[in-house]
Swiss-Prot record:
Belongs to the short scorpion toxin superfamily. Potassium channel inhibitor family. Alpha-KTx 04 subfamily. SUPFAM superfamilies: Scorpion toxin-like. InterPro entries: Scorpion_toxin-like_sf, Scorpion_toxinS_K_inh. This is Potassium channel toxin alpha-KTx 4.1. Has the structural arrangement of an alpha-helix connected to a beta-sheet by disulfide bonds (CSalpha/beta). Disulfide bonds join C29-C50, C35-C55, C39-C57. Residues 1-22 form the signal peptide. GO terms for cellular component: extracellular region. Expressed by the venom gland. Potently blocks Kv1.1/KCNA1 (85%), Kv1.2/KCNA2 (91%), Kv1.3/KCNA3 (89%), Kv1.6/KCNA6 (94%), and Shaker (97%). It is found in: Secreted. The lineage of its organism: Eukaryota, Metazoa, Ecdysozoa, Arthropoda, Chelicerata.
């Protein structure tokens, strides 16, 4: 059971590190397809989505 909790803590830490790589850009959007060219221009990779009217890009 201790091993389970240890592995769970490791997964939580890894997911926190991975999620911190996202970048919010100051570009308004109404849908995720609008963010793809804006993310490509901002960070060089067309990977992102629209959240709360702003583009969120993933490097």
């Amino acid at each position: 059971m201790k091993a389970f909790y240890g592995i769970l803590i490791i997964f939580i830490l890894i997911s926190m590190i991975d999620l911190s790589k996202q970048v919010f850009i100051n570009a308004k959007c109404r849908g995720s397809p609008e963010c793809l060219p804006k993310c490509k221009e901002a960070i060089g990779k067309a990977a992102g989505k629209c959240m709360n009217g702003k583009c969120k890009c993933y490097p």
